[in-house]
Amino acid sequence: LTTTTTEMLQAIQNGDLQKINSLFEYFLMNEEPEAQYEIADLFMQYGYLNEANRVYEHLQFIFPNEAQLSIDRASVLIELGEEDEALQLLMGIDNEAPEYPQSLLLLADYYQMQGLYEVAEQRINEALEIMPHEPLLKFAKAELLFETGRFSEAVRLYEELHEKEKNVAGVLLSTRLAEVYRAGGGYETALDYYMEALEEIVTPDLLFGSGYAAFQCEKFELAIKQLEDLKELDPDYFSAYLLLAESFAMLEDNKNAYKVILEGIKRDEYEKSFYLFAGKIALKNHLTDEAIDHLQQAIALDPEYMEAILVLMSIYAGEERYSDIIALYEDLKNEEFDWSALYPIVADAYSEEEQVNRAYEIYKLAYNEFKEDASFLSKYCYFLIEDGQRHEARKIALQLNALQPYEQQWLDLLDTLE
C-alpha cells in the first residue's frame, strides 16, 4: 500500500472525516484503481456513502463499460436515496453480461424494500433462469417468500440449501429454518433447528427463540433453562422475563413466576404486560393487595388497557369493594372510554351500593350484549324483583327458562311471579 492509501485507510478506521477530505482529491488523482476500489468498499462498510459514491463515479469514468462498477455504485445510490439514478445504472447493464444476475438481485432487493414483492420475485426468477443453482439467488428468493408469509415455499428452498451448506450470505441457515418454522407454527421442528443453531453460535435471539418454541411445545423445563441462560447472557432482554415467568406459572411454580416478573419490572418499568401478569400471579400467591397495586400501575400506563381493567374489577368484586368498581368505571367514562364487557360488574356494584336508578341504567345497557348469559340474566332478574319491576322480571325469567329449561328454579321463579 502507498503512503496515501495507508493514511486514507487509517483515517476511515479512526472516523477522521477532516483527514479523509484532505486526502481525497490526491487519492483519486494518483492512486491505482485497484486501491481506489478497495477503499470505496471500505467507505461503504464504515458508512461514508457520499465518499464511496464519488470513488465509484470516478472509476466509472475510467472504466465506463465495467458492469460491476455500475452495480456497486447503484447499491450506494440506493442507500443515499438516489433511486432513479441507481435504477438507470442497473437497467443499463447488458443482459448478456456475467454480472447481469447480480444486477437483477440488487433490483429485487430494491423492489422488496419498496413493498413491490411481485416485481421483486420476477427479477429473482429471471436471475434463477440464468443461474438456477446459485445459492445466493435461491437464498434471496427464500428470504422474499419468508417475508411475504409463504412459509412452506420458503422452507423448501432453505432446506435445499441447508442440505449442502451451513451458511449463505453470512446467515446461518438453521437459524432461518428455525424462524420460518416458528412463524408458520411448526414449533417442534423450529425447536430442533434452534438447538442446532445454538451448537454453532449462542445469541440472545436464538436463546429466546428456542425458549419460545419450547414453551409452545409445552416443554416448560427446557423453556426455563433457555430463558435463564438468556437472562444471564443479556439481563436487558426484556421479553425473556415475561416468557420465563409464564413458563414457571405453567409448572404451577407461582412463587418463582412472581419473582421473575418482579425482576422484569425492575428492568423495564414501562411495560404494561409485566404489570398485568404480576397482578394475575400475585393473586395466585394470595397477595391481593399487591395484585391490585400491579394492575393499577398497568392501567396508569394505559388507561384503556382492557384486560387489566377487567381483572382489577373482578378482584374488586371478589373483595366486595363496590365503591372502587364505581370509581374506576366513572374514571373511564370521564376519559370517554366505554366497554360493554364491564357493564355486568358495574351494574352489580351500583346495585350493592343501593344506587338503584344507576344500576338499572347499566343493567339495561348490558342486556343487549349479555341476553344469552344466564348468570347475568339471573342477577338482572333478581334486581328487577327487588326493585318492584315484576312484569319486566318475568320477561327475564322466561328467557332464563328458555336458556336452561332443565333448571327447576326458573319454573319456580315464574310461578312466584305469576
Where are these regions (language model features)?
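Canonical tetratricopeptide repeat
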Residues: 38, 72, 106, 140, ...
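Structural marker of alpha-solenoid helical repeat scaffolds
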Residues: 29-30, 62, 95-96, 130, ...
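TPR-repeat structural position
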Residues: 16-17, 49, 83, 117, ...
